[in-house]
From Swiss-Prot:
Any GO CC annotation of this UniProt entry: DNA-directed RNA polymerase complex
Phylogenetic classification of the source organism: Bacteria, Pseudomonadati, Campylobacterota, Epsilonproteobacteria, Campylobacterales
InterPro entries: DNA-dir_RpoC_beta_prime, DNA-dir_RpoC_beta_prime_bact, RNA_pol_asu, RNA_pol_N, RNA_pol_Rpb1_1, RNA_pol_Rpb1_3, RNA_pol_Rpb1_3_sf, RNA_pol_Rpb1_4
Binding partners and assembly: The RNAP catalytic core consists of 2 alpha, 1 beta, 1 beta' and 1 omega subunit. When a sigma factor is associated with the core the holoenzyme is formed, which can initiate transcription.
Protein name as it appears in the record: DNA-directed RNA polymerase subunit beta'
Organism of provenance: Aliarcobacter butzleri (strain RM4018) (Arcobacter butzleri)
UniProt xrefs under SMART domains: RPOLA_N
Record key words, sorted: DNA-directed RNA polymerase, Magnesium, Metal-binding, Nucleotidyltransferase, Transcription, Transferase, Zinc
Annotated family: Belongs to the RNA polymerase beta' chain family.
Gene: rpoC
SUPFAM superfamilies recorded: beta and beta-prime subunits of DNA dependent RNA-polymerase (SSF64484)
Positions with a binding annotation for Mg(2+): 474, 476, 478
Amino acid sequence: MSNNEKVLSPIEIKELERPQDFSAFQLKLASPEKILSWSCGEVKKPETINYRTLKPERDGLFCAKIFGPVKDYECLCGKYKKMRYKGVVCEKCGVEVTSSKVRRHRMGHIELVSPVAHIWMVSSLPTRIGTLLGVKLKDLERVLYYEAYIVSNPGEAYYDNEKTKKVEKYDILNEEQYRTISDLFEHTGFEANMGGEIVRDLLAGLDLFELLTLLKEEMETTKSEAKRKTIIKRLKVVENFLNSGNRPEWMMLTQLPVLPPDLRPLVSLDGGKFAVSDVNDLYRRVINRNNRLKRLTELDAPEIIIRNEKRMLQEAVDALFDNGKTANAVKGANKRPLKSLSEIIKGKQGRFRQNLLGKRVDFSGRSVIVVGPSLNMDQCGIPKKMALELFKPHLMAKLEEKGYATTLKAAKRLIENESNEVWECLNEIVDEYPILLNRAPTLHKLSIQAFHPVLIDGKAIRLHPLVCAAFNADFDGDQMAVHVPLSQEAVAEAKILMMSSMNILLPASGRAIAVPSQDMILGIYYLSLVKEGVKGEHKLFTDVNEVKIALDMGQIDLHAKIRTRIGDRIIQTTVGRLIIHEILPSFVPANLWNKILKKKDIGILVDYIYKEAGYEVTPRFLDDLKNLGFKYATIAGISISIDDIRVPENKIMHISKSKKDVIEVQKQFSQGLLTEQERYNKIIDIWTEVNNKLASEMMELVKGDKNGFNSIYMMADSGARGSAAQIRQLSGMRGLMAKPDGSIIETPIISNFREGLNVLEYFISTHGARKGLADTALKTANAGYLTRKLIDVSQNVRITIEDCGTHEGIEITDITSGNELIESLEERITGRVIAEDIIDPISNEILFAEGTLITEEDAKVVTEAEVKSVVIRTPLTCKVENGLCSKCYGLNLGEQRKAKPGEAVGVVAAQSIGEPGTQLTLRTFHVGGTASATQTERELKADKEGFIRYYNIKKYVTTDGKIIVANRRNAGLLLVEPKINAPFKGKVTVETVHEEIILTIANSTEEKKYFLRKNDVAKANELAGISGKIEGKLYLPYKDGEEVNLNESIVEIIKDGWNVPNRIPFASELKVEDGAPVTSKIITGAKGIVKYYKLTGDYLERRHDIKAGDIITEKGLFAVIADTEDREALRHYISRGSCIALNDNTEVEKDTVISAPAKNEQVVIAEWDPYANPTIAEKAGVISFEDVIPGVTVSEQFDELTGTSKLVINEYIPSGYKPTVILTTDDNEIIRYSLDPKISLNVSEGKRVEVADIIGKTPKATQKSKDITGGLPRVSELFEARRPKNIAILASFDGVVSFGKGLRNKQKILITDSTGNSVEYLVEKSKQVLVHEGEFVHAGEALTDGQISPHDILRILGEKALHYFIVSEVQQVYRSQGVNIADKHIEVITSQMLRQVSILDGGDTKFIVGDMISKKKFKLENEKIIKLGGNPAIAEPLLLGITRAAVTSDSIISAASFQETTKVLTEAAISAKMDMLEDLKENVVIGRTIPVGTGLYKDQKVKFSEQEISK
């Protein structure tokens, strides 16, 4: 609890009084005494009511004496009626005269003859009773169901006559064993028994303290991991009992509580039948069996019969508590299993989800929606009939207040007659009163918005066209629900926060969602088009009014180019655009409206106006835009005719050529030149190519048609409806179709819709269409479930304070996938608070100080300064105990302002991720065919300028002088430009002090120090390409103690980097030497004056002697673009070999060429064989073979093209053989190369090889079509933190690789660090190992192929690396589908997945090793222990999937209402868990104000202060 000192004591809930406000909720096991104290009497008979008199039977399940009167203040026999006898107990029928409401909470009890186990304690895993006794679940069940004996006192008993195996306490014996042993050892005190009694006695006899110490001792001595796990399980249960004050024997019931009768009602239906709650049937069975058992015991029946009856009693109680868990569930009259107490509370139809989290409410209605184009942004049309019903109470009050009616009855009559006064009053009420509209499915907060109602005739609700996008509504029969907010607070909230004019932005991304669509876009687009050579062209007008007059008089065309004055400038525009300009606020610059406005441009315009003017102006502007759009869409008269669909003339020619190509491919296939897969891929490629060619020709044709006024083209181009792909199907060719399994059918549909499809083509196309529909249905369900899980895990995240004061942050860069940018740094830092100063890499000035909230403009400044990474505060590094602080969260995107305390950011995050879920694809992508027909990479080219640095590169030089890469990893090429040059010749020293690196250069006479920030310098693992990005980081080419010459660069900025093996494969040929210059065309990035400088030390020295035409030969030359006041705007490095294009002091515009390479070609950095991985000779020497046996391990393959034959190692090598090539060098050193399957040998026995000669080549896996999990399944895989099936093994720390002796089907990889510690990994032989003997690997580097598990990233690289992994992976899925989601939402969920820790060492705390504890509890407990001077516990962070994280929530109610209800409740009851009711979900369930918004302060006294307002 927030203030831990508060001592909580249990509250007795009194009958008939409202329970007082409680601050926590706790579950415990009930003792028999407690059950008796609840009970108002024993239920002795199974009867319910008398079917003749319909009165409850005495002592039965509905007994009025026990549970209270059926009618208010009236006893059963009718002797006492009315209030005045309250509290009297009738002497005739024994019923207390009171309110009948007591039947909802008065309980009864059943006195059980024999103790019975509570099924949750037995079969809810881990079984609690079994764990305490140390008995397996199966055995425990056999004892409870009277099939086996449990030993309560072993005495001196043995299992055998030789007395070798002793009988222990709690051993389980079958009938035979029991007979034998008890005959032999009865006299020694041996006792065993079966059933509930003995289990209860054993539980009662447990000494928990003794058991605890025993277990702890055993834990320390045991070596076996499996045994430890079992001990930990037992320890947890024992500790739970000790801490909670529960007694173990309470898990066995001797008194069974009976639910109050009104909670298991018996309702009479018409026709004399009764609807009865299933629980009653289950209780009747228990009572029947209990009574029968009582009778049998009194009669002294034979043991076997009594035993059977006891077993049946146990089964009856089991069925009552949890009918689903029992093997053969009890079925009712309709052959359906009866709903037991557990089933009533769990599942979608259970108490939690059906009645507590979602309720039906009054003052609501629903109807079909139709469009209301004449409404304002915050209005909606409500049918009069509906309003009359919804506002009835308000209306009656109003009628009385105005004197139209004297009594309520009169008012009711007036309303029924619908007289004029009624409508008058209704209009007055409705005027000021907001209503809420909701469209199911309610996926995000914009699915419920408030409107001012406008009364209309008819029966449909009218909706404003611009809010459709937020509701995801259309008018094809959608329905919406209307709700009336009742309380003053609710009305205020609706008016201030929920009005649709306040909900213009999407909370997921901060972009405007209330933007015009379809017809409106078409109208605005039409208005903004230009037509050449029309009436009134090039005229000059004074203002818009003059233009309008001319237009109305027919003197000028709507699309004519004209000139007019706007502000103080004359502008060239068109009539239509002027009309648009008229509705724009005055501050909108011309470049936003004076152009053709498409959907995207309109969106940008709305965003801009919102940013500049906010809620005051935007709604009004949107309404004007809507009206304009509809008006001109109508005037334009755009309609589709069949002639608008233009088919390219040379379609037939293209298609016949493609058919020939296909026949050619088939021929090659039948001659055996192509494999089946290649044939298929080639055919698909042919058709894809022709389809694209036709499409581009057709688009040109349509675009030119009617000067760009072709209706279909206008619709697609403006973004109103349709797309290029759809036009292609109308008038190009339909193209290739997919089968339901996602594979592409190789026969394309050649026809288009204009020509019409033939039967076969139509049949092929039905395939895809049906799959689409089936997918959509599945997708909706999956997306809905994902949203539910996300909401549940993040519902308790809210902003609680302004600033948590942390200085920690996470470094972020662009998110890229390969070479494709997924999300830019600019987008990622907008609206975030930075955790470290942002420093300009060129001038070293502080651009923004720590703690600044970065706006969109600031983000642009950062990108223009070429800052490559920024450290921002994130929800993961926030230090607040409950929730987050405003600064770590950043901007509230839905309102574009700082998040305030009390905002439910967790729910918003979950909605933002879940809502677009339905737009994601469901399938896993099959790569192959068109999808991956990309050219294989065979070389690397540089596209920036600078010079080359080798990082760790080892090389072989071949006889003909080629440089071959000898590293397999941990090396790379860097493209750099100088940052600091050596001011004199000297020795370099590098030292790290805290967050700084001090670089000193010194000789006998002088010394100079340079200070660098540690974070700015590229780390070793970044240079090796393991983590992070290196562009923009600093590189130190000289190590500590090395000599450096004058003007050599000692600090360099990395502009690009290619690491081995990801970008440059092993054995590639390098085309550039270390230090070689790389030139490329340099273009100015800003406007200004070009000046040339030379770098000396760490400052620039002016050079006046550089002129156009010079070819640069010196290092360290920069061109600086300066503004008029000689401030540096940008600097460009000019590398050696560049030809200067501009003289010094030339004034330039943006995008002017400063210099270009003297030789006109792109610099190739490296080349390699794209189809094979070579094995090369490290030294010169002679080859010999081992285990290379033709017909056994190798086969000879004849190459048709070259006419030679080669040896190829077989794919499957018989066990016992290990084909190897042995190279004996000239120094008699022996190097062994073990040969992988499929490798083809380029050498023969006894052949001499030189350095870097190729020994053999392994073909790269012929492009297997890989299944890439994409779309929705990928997102849920990430959030569920699933361990991938094909998991990659990662190195746990930096070290050197070696291979140990392998097992039969596993190989052993060892990694040894610098101190000699080593760790070994066993890898399946079928896995491809990516490392080689003697290589150095970094922590987190993959040793084998496969997918990387997020758990490994967390374990090895920590939370920050995990943050990058999850955010970038989720963003890749959403961005590829065109969905924008801000990172902060994903981070909020990730921080919730990391809220648990796993205990490594319990110290002096109450935690046990292996416990999963929330970070909050862990911190509290540790603080407590440290105060007392003890040893704190040590833990490691755990990554839990969202389902696990939600179920392990600290709150009982929250976890129970999510999933696995019985498990959660059992756990909570045993450990007497306390729910502090801090989060949203539990407060919704118990019906209190939720702690967000103003509810955050509900416990605090609010003070009011008066203020004088000056008039």
